Design a protein with these regions (language model features):
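An accessory alpha-helical subdomain
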Residues: 114-172
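Residue-level detector of alpha-helix initiation sites
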Residues: 21-22, 68, 114
C-alpha cells in the first residue's frame, strides 16, 4: 500500500531516464517543483543510462519504452533505497505520480495506485469543478491570516471551528 505524501524537492537532484513525451512531461512536473532534474536518454543528452546515474538522486523515474531497462533502473534504485517510478509498471514502483490539481494554495492529488490512472484523472477533474474560485480565495485569506488566528484562538479546536465556519457555505 502506498502512503500519500507531499515532498519538498526544491534543489534536490532527480533523475529521469527516457526522453519521450511521458518522460519529458514528468521531468517538467519535477522542475516545476524546483527539483534539479537530469534527463538521461540518447535523444536528449547523446548517451544511454549508466548504473552510476542513480547515485545521489533523491528520486528516479524510469520512463523508457524498454521495460527491461526500466526494471533494471528500478532494481538499482531499490537496492540503494532510492524512490523509483517505472512508468506503466506498478510492480516496479516505490512511488507513483498522482493526478494533480493546483488552485491557489490548494493542491489535490489523486491516485489509483497505478491501477487506472484515467480514473484518478477523472476524480481530480471532478474535484476541480467543485473548487470554486471564491472558495480558493477564502482558503488563501485564511492562510495569510493563520498566524493572527493562532494568536486570537490559541485553542486548536476553537481555531478549527472558526475556519470551518468561514468555509461552511462551500460544504453545504
Amino acid at each position: 500500500m502506498l502512503f500519500p505524501l507531499f515532498l519538498e524537492l526544491e534543489g534536490r537532484p532527480c533523475l529521469v531516464v527516457g526522453g519521450g513525451p511521458v518522460a519529458l512531461r514528468k521531468a517538467k512536473a519535477l522542475e516545476d517543483c524546483g527539483a534539479r532534474v537530469t534527463v538521461v536518454a540518447p535523444e536528449v543528452c547523446g548517451r544511454g543510462f549508466a548504473d552510476a546515474d542513480v547515485e545521489g538522486m533523491t528520486l528516479v523515474l524510469a520512463a523508457t519504452n524498454d521495460r527491461a531497462l526500466n526494471r533494471r533502473v528500478a532494481d538499482l534504485c531499490r537496492a540503494r533505497g532510492i524512490p523509483v517510478n517505472a512508468v506503466d509498471d506498478p510492480a516496479n514502483c516505490t512511488f507513483v505520480f498522482p493526478a494533480v490539481l493546483r488552485k491557489g494554495p490548494m493542491t489535490v492529488a489523486v491516485s489509483s495506485g497505478g491501477a487506472c490512472p484515467v480514473a484518478a484523472k477523472m476524480v481530480r477533474d471532478k474535484v476541480g469543478r467543485l473548487m470554486a474560485d471564491d472558495f480558493v480565495s477564502e482558503v488563501g485569506r485564511l492562510g495569510r491570516e493563520r498566524e493572527q488566528l493562532k494568536r486570537d484562538f490559541p485553542d486548536p479546536q476553537a481555531r478549527k471551528r472558526v475556519c470551518e465556519e468561514a468555509l461552511r457555505k462551500w460544504n453545504d
